């Protein structure tokens, strides 16, 4: 769960590729991006591009792919099954942006993106053969499921005003939740993130715990 949810999703797809919040050595980037394949949503390129070009550009407005204004379950899970978001937000300008960062034109990352299902199923099968069904189920399948639930919880709850507090008057409805932040690797310091979207840490106060921010400091060394 730590490798998939924290290293792969929160740090890799979200802060590193999605927001260019920090830099790291290439070999660490490779490991981090490999972990991101087990995100529970699917292919890695679309998630990054939709999040950046759709959600942050139109947060809680028309065009936001996963705003709870369209309903809780839409924001929680079903949005990424709607083809229109892929059509609207994956355009040439966005592709060029990520080509410059060596993401979508990297042959290895193209392989991860195009074969994400085979990699997920293959890893589960290999873990079963080598270590037994317990490792496959509780180690891999649960890790993928927990990562999906983690990210879905952030996208749904963190834009309800009753769920937390705001440090900044942003144009969206994002809020922070200290307890939720501990459980989601720092991602529920969401109002802070929408104010400083390219910061490597979402914490703005000693009482706001951002595990991902701590891990990033270690990865940069």
Predicted features along the sequence, with ranges:
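Acidic active-site catalytic centers that drive phospho-/nucleotidyl reactions
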Residues: 51, 191-194
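Active-site-proximal inter-transmembrane loops
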Residues: 98-107, 163-189, 196
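Non-catalytic, topology-defining segments of multipass membrane proteins
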Residues: 1-153, 157-158, 198-221
